[in-house]
């Protein structure tokens, strides 16, 4: 499935292909989302800060492989009727995503602080909120919680600011990522895992937090937060 998801980026250029290849093979969150069967089969998903659409490409490839009868028998079935939507503020990445996805997902050029979330089943924010000031983080989370349908899922990944050395490595990686977007001197706004959980729970979400840095020197945590029915 990772090979199929990467293949679509060849037409978008070598850098886009290499980036997708590296993310899908070395970032544990993509494997976890499919292997754990976290996503619903139907409804709608919005990936905020989707970049060049790697997660969307993975979900599209998984759906196609399942339809062709080539899905691993020991894995949970992937979403087959989940409408996919991505949002990113970087024009170049949006262009790459649209080319790679070839109509398999709706990808919009917009600042996530201003986007119309619309009612949805799943909201994904991977390594996104640390680039926003704390007040902005809270406003985005408030909008996200409101947009989620009852029983809906918010998938949030952020670094744990209490993780000492691993946190410094994660910040360095985030700064380098910002540099590739031409944002030299970007200030990061991080919280401890406990503070992230508390912030989500204050909005009525039931939160499960799990480390999401296997095979890396980082201290990322995946927060699986569900809106109570």
What are these regions (language model features)?
Residues 1-44, 52-116, 153-229:
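Class I (Rossmann-like) S-adenosyl-L-methionine-dependent methyltransferase catalytic domain
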Residues 48:
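Conserved beta-strand/loop positions that form the S-adenosyl-L-methionine
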Residues 124:
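A conserved beta-strand element that flanks and buttresses the S-adenosyl-L-methionine
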Residues 133-134:
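Helix-capping/helix-break motifs at membrane-protein junctions
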């Amino acid at each position: 499935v990772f090979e199929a998801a990467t293949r679509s980026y060849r037409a978008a250029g070598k850098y886009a292909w290499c980036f997708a290849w590296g993310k899908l093979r070395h970032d544990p969150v993509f494997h976890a989302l499919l292997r754990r069967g976290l996503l619903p089969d139907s409804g709608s998903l919005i990936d905020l800060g989707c970049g060049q659409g790697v997660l969307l490409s993975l979900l599209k490839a998984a759906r196609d492989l399942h339809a062709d009868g080539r899905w691993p028998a020991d894995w949970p079935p992937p979403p087959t009727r989940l409408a996919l939507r991505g949002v990113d503020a970087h024009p170049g990445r949006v262009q790459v995503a649209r080319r790679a996805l070839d109509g398999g997902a709706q990808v919009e050029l917009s600042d996530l602080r201003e986007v119309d979330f619309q009612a949805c089943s799943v909201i994904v924010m991977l390594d996104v909120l640390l680039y926003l000031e704390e007040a902005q983080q809270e406003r985005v989370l408030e909008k996200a919680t409101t947009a989620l349908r009852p029983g809906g899922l918010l998938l949030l990944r952020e670094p744990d600011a209490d993780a000492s050395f691993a946190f410094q490595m994660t910040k360095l990686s985030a700064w380098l990522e910002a540099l590739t977007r031409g944002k030299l001197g970007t200030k990061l706004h991080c919280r401890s895992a406990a503070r992230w959980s508390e912030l989500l729970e204050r909005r009525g979400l039931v939160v499960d937090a799990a480390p999401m840095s296997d095979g890396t020197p980082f201290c990322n945590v995946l927060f699986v937060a569900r809106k109570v029915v």
